[in-house]
């Protein structure tokens, strides 16, 4: 049903329209997407006729800044923070609404000689400003269009249009698949685009490395920063870097302040952290990644709010969902990049979570063995662990 990102890029370079599908837990919709440079009157008319949604022009911050395209509102209350600017028409257009005139306005946005005064406001083209960092910062169609344009070697600008059914309802994946087949279009997901970007773009910088004696032995600690969100991550390493081709014992541990530092009994994070360090030290060779993904990615304060809901009878999954989050928001692309930087090619992964295995293998790393890391349950965390086993698929035994 979905095509590889590489095939979609080739189609875009040829001037074709593709379909980009959002995550089912976000807007769960599909947009027609084309490169702005290929937004001919025929492409605009195709989107208007078969998409029926609003035709918008996602732009990089640089292009929007050069043309003084300011936000439509001072206080954006849209649930997805879609960054509309004031709508525009080129001053040489008449009504600005025809496919020919909308195409003309879009092409003028790409002209490096265009200036702000070349456009009148409001108009019939709706520019959108993509966030710096693209889909790795915000998983929206705006960012997807700009990321795809840049991946094609084009300017950071695209054209998008939401796809609606003939009855006016939003087209979902089954209908989108029919539309793609009918018009012979490539169809991709933003999720796959995120994975593609993690694989082709180096987003971590090794900032420092030091020797750290611990209760478990002496480790070499490497500090990394993420270019997209500025978060800082650590790698505790025992053994020589870069590693050779032999499988390395690896633990990917997400930050848990309450468990790691304050010995909370609500989870098993602290004991898992210590057990992993001990096992790596015993083996004499390995890596523990400490990723800043507190609360399975929802952050410390939201994790505490989830705890409060658990006190009212929710389990850990239900609490996340009640707060508007997925059960697990963690992404392992940054971790995979750190492991690659350390020369890890093959690993034995310390985990009870099969999704973590799939997450790392999705970024081209080889996992030869899963090494269980089950801690003894307590009266305080037994239900939590049972929920992870039943609802999140963790491989635990009681």
Swiss-Prot record:
Q: Which domain of life is it from?
A: Bacteria
Which terms does the record give in the GO molecular function aspect?
3,4-dihydroxy-2-butanone-4-phosphate synthase activity; GTP binding; GTP cyclohydrolase II activity; magnesium ion binding; manganese ion binding; zinc ion binding
Query: Reaction(s) catalyzed by this protein?
Result: D-ribulose 5-phosphate = (2S)-2-hydroxy-3-oxobutyl phosphate + formate + H(+); GTP + 4 H2O = 2,5-diamino-6-hydroxy-4-(5-phosphoribosylamino)-pyrimidine + formate + 2 phosphate + 3 H(+)
Q: Where is this region: GTP cyclohydrolase II?
A: 200-398
Amino-acid positions noted as binding GTP in the UniProt annotation, renumbered to this chain: 251-255, 272, 294-296, 316, 351, 356
Show the segment(s) annotated as DHBP synthase. Answer: 1-199
Binding note for cofactor: Binds 2 divalent metal cations per subunit. Magnesium or manganese. Binds 1 zinc ion per subunit.
Q: Which cofactor does it need?
A: Mg(2+); Mn(2+); Zn(2+)
Q: Which GO terms describe its cellular component?
A: cytosol
Q: Where does Mg(2+) 2 bind?
A: 27, 141
EC id: 4.1.99.12, 3.5.4.25
Q: Where is the active site?
A: 328, 330
Task: Point out the annotated site residues (description: Essential for DHBP synthase activity).
Answer: 124, 162
Q: What job does this protein perform?
A: Catalyzes the conversion of D-ribulose 5-phosphate to formate and 3,4-dihydroxy-2-butanone 4-phosphate. Catalyzes the conversion of GTP to 2,5-diamino-6-ribosylamino-4(3H)-pyrimidinone 5'-phosphate (DARP), formate and pyrophosphate.
Entry similarity comment: In the N-terminal section; belongs to the DHBP synthase family. In the C-terminal section; belongs to the GTP cyclohydrolase II family.
UniProt protein name: Riboflavin biosynthesis protein RibBA
Q: Which gene encodes it?
A: ribBA
């Amino acid at each position: 049903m979905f095509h590889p990102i590489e095939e979609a890029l080739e189609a875009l370079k040829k001037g074709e329209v593709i379909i980009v599908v959002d995550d089912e837990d976000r807007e769960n919709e599909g947009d027609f997407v084309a490169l702005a440079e290929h937004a001919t009157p025929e492409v605009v008319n195709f989107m208007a006729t078969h998409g029926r949604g609003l035709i918008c022009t996602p732009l990089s911050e640089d292009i929007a800044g050069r043309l003084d395209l300011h936000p439509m509102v001072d206080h954006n209350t849209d649930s997805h923070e879609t960054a509309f600017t004031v709508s525009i028409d080129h001053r040489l257009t008449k009504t600005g609404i025809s496919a020919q005139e909308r195409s003309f306005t879009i092409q003028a946005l790409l002209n490096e000689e265009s200036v702000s005064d070349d456009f009148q406001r409001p108009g019939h083209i709706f520019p959108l400003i993509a966030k710096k960092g693209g889909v790795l910062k915000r998983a929206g169609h705006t960012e997807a269009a700009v990321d795809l344009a840049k991946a094609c070697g084009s300017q950071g600008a695209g054209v998008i249009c939401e796809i609606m059914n003939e009855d006016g309802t939003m087209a979902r994946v089954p209908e989108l698949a029919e539309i793609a087949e009918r018009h012979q279009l490539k169809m991709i997901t933003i999720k796959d685009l995120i994975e593609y970007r993690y694989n082709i773009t180096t987003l971590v910088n090794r900032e420092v490395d030091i020797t750290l004696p611990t209760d478990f032995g002496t480790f070499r600690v490497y500090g990394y920063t993420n270019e997209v969100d500025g978060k800082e991550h650590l790698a505790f390493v025992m053994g020589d870097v870069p590693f050779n081709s032999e499988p390395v014992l690896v633990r990917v541990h997400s930050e848990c302040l309450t468990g790691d530092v304050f010995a909370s009994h609500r989870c098993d994070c602290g004991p898992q952290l210590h057990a992993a360090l001990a096992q790596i030290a015993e083996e004499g060779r390995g890596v523990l990644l400490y990723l800043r993904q507190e609360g399975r990615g929802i952050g410390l304060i939201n994790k505490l709010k989830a705890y409060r809901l658990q006190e009212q009878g929710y389990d850990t999954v239900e609490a996340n969902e009640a707060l508007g989050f997925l059960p697990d928001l963690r992404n392992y692309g940054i971790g995979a990049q750190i492991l690659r930087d350390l020369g890890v090619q093959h690993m034995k992964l310390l985990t009870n979570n099969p999704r973590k295995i799939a997450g790392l293998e999705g970024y081209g790393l080889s996992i030869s063995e899963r090494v269980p890391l089950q801690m003894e349950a307590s009266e305080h965390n037994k239900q939590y662990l049972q929920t992870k086993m039943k609802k999140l698929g963790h491989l635990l035994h009681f």
